[in-house]
Regions:
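Conserved short beta-strand edge segments in small beta-sheet-based binding/regulatory domains
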Residues: 97-109
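Short acidic amphipathic segments
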Residues: 58-70
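Bacterial N-terminal signal peptides
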Residues: 10-24
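Boundary of Sec targeting at the N-terminus
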Residues: 27-28
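Short, surface-exposed ligand-recognition loops at beta-strand->loop->(often short) alpha-helix junctions
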Residues: 40-50
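N-terminal secretory signal peptides that target proteins for export/translocation
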Residues: 1-7
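Helix N-cap motif at beta-to-alpha junctions
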Residues: 81-86
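Short, low-order "capping/linker" segments at domain edges
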Residues: 111-126
Length: 126
């Protein structure tokens, strides 16, 4: 092999190596995104104030990146990392006074809810 051929070979090898590393590096964010999960949980509430409390309480749980509660269906949808845990979300909501399909509301938490948010008192959704 001549020195010119060796130089061309080294240059091509270097370019392929750089290209390969670039492809691998750009794929990493997609791998991390794939590790996100979505959790749905039925949570009782009746109003906009409940919505704010439910969503902010869920957001305080480790791993939750987004929380959206639908007043019509009582469904809370959380998006977050693989570390997000459905039971931990339900437990945090129970402590805040909201029952869910996984946990009963803490009596103290429920008693501390504003009167308009006490969903078991027969309050209509508003």
């Amino acid at each position: 092999m001549t020195t010119i051929q060796a130089h061309i070979f080294k240059s091509l090898f270097s370019l392929l190596l750089i290209f390969g590393l670039t492809v691998v590096a750009s794929a990493q964010p997609n791998v991390a995104k794939g590790m996100e999960q979505t959790i749905s949980l039925k949570v009782s509430g009746v109003c906009g104030e409940c919505k704010h409390r439910i969503e902010s309480t869920a957001m305080d749980v480790k791993g939750v990146k987004k929380a959206e509660w639908d007043i019509k269906t009582d469904m809370l949808v959380c998006v977050g990392s693989a570390k997000m845990d459905k039971q931990k979300i339900a437990d945090a909501l129970a402590k805040a006074g909201h029952k869910s399909e996984l946990a009963a509301a803490d009596p103290k938490g429920y008693a501390n809810l504003p009167a308009c948010c006490q969903y078991d008192s027969g309050a209509d959704k508003h």
